Amino acid sequence: MEEIQRYLQLDRSQQHDCLYPLIFQEYIYALAHDHGLNRSILLENPGYDNKSSLLIVKRLITRMYQQNHFFISVNDSNQDQFFGRNKNLYSQMISEGFAFIVEMTFSLRLISSLEGKEIFKSHNLRSIHSIFPFLEDNFSHLNCVLDILIPHPVHPEILVQTLRFWVKDASSLHLLRFFLHEYWNNLITLKKPSSSFSKRNQRLFFFLYNSHVCEYESIFVFLRNQSSHLRSTSFGALLERIYFYGKIERLVEVFAKDFQATLWLFKDPFIHYVRYQGKLILASKGTPLLMNKWKYYLVNFWQCYFYLWSRPGRIYINQLSNHSLDFMGYLSSVRLNPSMVRSQMLENAFLVNNVIKKFDTLLPIIPLIGSLAKAKFCNILGNPISKPVRADLSDSDIIDRFGRICRNLSHYHSGSSKKKSLYRIKYILRLSCAKTLARKHKSSVRAFLKRFGSGLLEEFLTSEEQVLSLTFPRASSTLWGVYRSRIWYLDIICINDLANHQ
């Protein structure tokens, strides 16, 4: 990270804080492709990876400004073999390179803006699991919640205009505008198999989307008092807190005139706001009538000030006591636990019924089994099946792959209140691994386990217990109690692919 900062600061100082020349630097694409910095950045290596060739990048960017020749024709005899076979390769290259440049540049600005300020910076808050302790502490005292799907911009120019306030380099903005206008259909149809944007190349769109969301997030005055729970200095693929701290100091002064009629909505001290990717949760202690006003305010707010068209039907008002939130791979709700207390005064006895609210998180077993079925670990009914593997893979490699998936799922879903569903998922993965090994050795599962022993699959059972036994080495009863309770880990920076079933 320090080497990347040094190179970016060097180039930006030479180019007067312009980002456009960085697009023609070969090492930018080497970093974007995770090739490291072990090559010289001053000389072009002819034998270097073709995908990161400086000459190819220059030729591709030149073609972007040729309006009638933006798409490379396969029948063009003047085109070399490389361009003829890879019509969409240059779009992926420029997307990765530009995303890397803006991410690292804005992260440097964020770090410099935080220097000298007394802002709590904890690496633990980079974990997405840190959201759930916040929900546990606050949501059990609230009544209503707005479950919102954030609308997407309908035109690429909206994203460019948002970035225009931060990037003063006109050439970079023109390049981004050309790129988005030509590939907007690919960006908004990311789920199509024929899309030229792979998961890796979606990071530019995610960066632009989060920068746009950050603009209207900063207007919410109530975040001024609650921002201590949301601070995160992570600068990975998603930068959601860029310039948030600088804007929050002048919120009331800038927006008081425009929102005089609606500022009373923000005076509720029990409003809490949580967002992850494209889903937003707004919870309050107020009545459903107040939340309904919030609902229509957000719709008009997005349309009038940010040109985002949202239907009121995409915003749901629910009671926390009788509704579960499908959020980040968990079903979260506030459960009412009644408790009977017997009180006696002299000769009279009383029974007092107390109700305690408890924040509950459950594992959505049906969608998760659907994800496992899609990944060919089981069928749609949850019955384990064998996965086809390469013949050159050893047994230890197969077990290690299954064990890694099982550990990741157990690690992420350790916060579930009830472990029964998690045990079922581990059982599916364990039996799927056994069937895969038996298929490789052309035998039945029973014969395979009898031959090699059931200890071959112990990795599925000992992963989590070993971690907890190191934490609580003395009392086995304490270990069992902790193992059955919710555990939130502070080292999870992304949601598991199988858990992200939405």
From Swiss-Prot:
Record has Chloroplast as a keyword: yes
Keyword line: Chloroplast, mRNA processing, Plastid, RNA-binding, tRNA processing
Superkingdom of origin organism: Eukaryota
A matching Pfam family: Intron_maturas2
One of the protein's GO biological processes: tRNA processing
GO molecular function: RNA binding
Gene Ontology annotations for the cellular component aspect, listed alphabetically: chloroplast
Subcellular location: Plastid, Chloroplast
Family assignment from sequence similarity: Belongs to the intron maturase 2 family. MatK subfamily.
Function, as annotated: Usually encoded in the trnK tRNA gene intron. Probably assists in splicing its own and other chloroplast group II introns.
This protein's name: Maturase K
Provenance organism: Ehretia anacua
